[in-house]
Design a protein with these regions (language model features):
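Glycan-processing catalytic domains of CAZymes
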Residues: 1-366
Length: 366
């Protein structure tokens, strides 16, 4: 990515951060190393095929790709376009527009904007729609109620939200679709009750961020400074997808994995639009170094136990056939199902077993 070369140095990728991560306390699992040191390149179709193969093998229904559009300028669009150009990569997918400014916050604790998220005019909305349309019309694209599923990360940041989404719906119907099924990610905010909440069919409880918003203050015993060294479509679909705490320069914050999951499982759907979330792990040390947020006590066995409970929760309380998972390959934030050197395929096996024990495994492939 030319912009990454300019902003972070020649040859920079997310793997650069992952490789350079260092533990901040005894027993801290850093750096995270992909199994067989598979630091793949997502501009290589072989990597996409590998991801799709293992995802399907272990029961993942599909992927949700982050999409970056800045008034016609795109970043990191190649993997999604490569997916489109290679129909043999046989995995359902949908798109989430990650509509935020890009800043240097995680690297330098700076609010300097690298590229500003703007929303353009009607002409830009039209261009954006027709870029997305080619994906919406792909046979692998995920549909709900006969409409392509499109997620918006931060709808409250879009000043012309109603005008834009209604225009896109109009264009969709003019181009052979029944419209667009809009979703948004509930993080530390809730757009459902906003005056544009009616535009959305679904709201995703993005975890673990949502549970922090739901319970803004973790009790002291559940939140503490880490001590540094020196001072599923028949059945459930698993679709694979910051803190506001004051931290000192050397004070990563640790959370208890078990407690976070217990809180997630205690959440009741606020309305019929709510879609439950799940998370495998979270540790953004590769990006934030000694200012990271870290979950402790993570194991494949615990993940399997809690995911199985969330599947039942989704089915019986939310009445939904999908869960959005953080994440497939967010290595820079410790959220990944992909195999690593510590657990091998442990997290993917946990997904498979959780689906099987709850009767939601569509095809047994192991």
């Amino acid at each position: 990515v030319p912009e990454n070369d300019k902003w972070w140095g020649k040859g920079f990728t997310e793997w650069t951060n992952v490789k350079s991560a260092k533990p901040v306390f005894k027993g801290h699992y850093q750096p995270r190393v992909p199994l067989n040191k598979n630091y793949y390149d997502l501009t290589d179709v072989k990597a996409l095929k590998w991801q799709a193969d293992i995802a399907q093998k272990y029961g993942i229904y599909g992927f949700c790709y982050y999409h970056y559009w800045f008034d016609g300028h795109m970043l990191m669009e190649k993997p999604m376009e490569l997916m489109l150009a290679n129909p043999e990569v046989d995995l359902p997918f949908c798109i989430c527009w990650a509509n935020e400014n890009w800043t240097k916050a995680w690297a330098q604790h700076s609010k300097k904007i690298l590229i500003s998220q703007t929303y353009g005019d009607r002409e830009d909305w039209k261009n954006h729609f027709f870029y997305l349309l080619q994906f919406f019309k792909d046979k692998r694209y995920i549909y709900e109620n006969g409409k392509p599923l499109f997620v918006i990360y931060r709808p409250e940041l879009i000043p012309t939200l109603r005008e834009m989404l209604e225009y896109w719906n109009k264009l969709a119907m003019e181009n052979g679709l029944k419209g667009i099924s809009y979703m948004y990610q509930q993080h530390d905010y809730d757009h459902t009750k906003a005056d544009t909440g009616d535009l959305f069919d679904y709201s995703i409880e993005y975890q673990p961020g949502r549970v922090k918003g739901y319970y803004p203050k973790f009790p002291k015993k559940e939140q503490q400074k880490c001590h540094p060294f020196i001072t599923i479509r028949i059945g459930l679909n698993l679709i694979v997808n910051k803190l506001h705490l004051k931290q000192t320069k050397l004070s990563s914050i640790c959370y208890d994995y078990d407690d976070a999951w217990k809180r997630i499982l205690s959440i009741k759907p606020q309305d019929e639009k709510a879609v439950p979330g799940a998370f495998v792990d979270w540790d953004n040390t590769p990006r934030y170094k000694s200012r990271a947020s870290i979950y402790q006590g993570v194991t494949p066995a615990k993940f399997e136990k809690y995911l199985a409970k969330q599947i039942i929760h989704a089915r019986e309380d939310y009445h939904k056939d999908m869960i959005f998972m953080f994440a497939w390959n967010e290595w820079g934030e410790g959220g990944y199902l992909e195999p690593d050197e510590k657990y091998g395929y442990g997290m993917l096996k946990a997904v498979y077993r959780a689906l099987k024990k709850t009767g939601e495994l569509e095809n047994e492939r192991l």
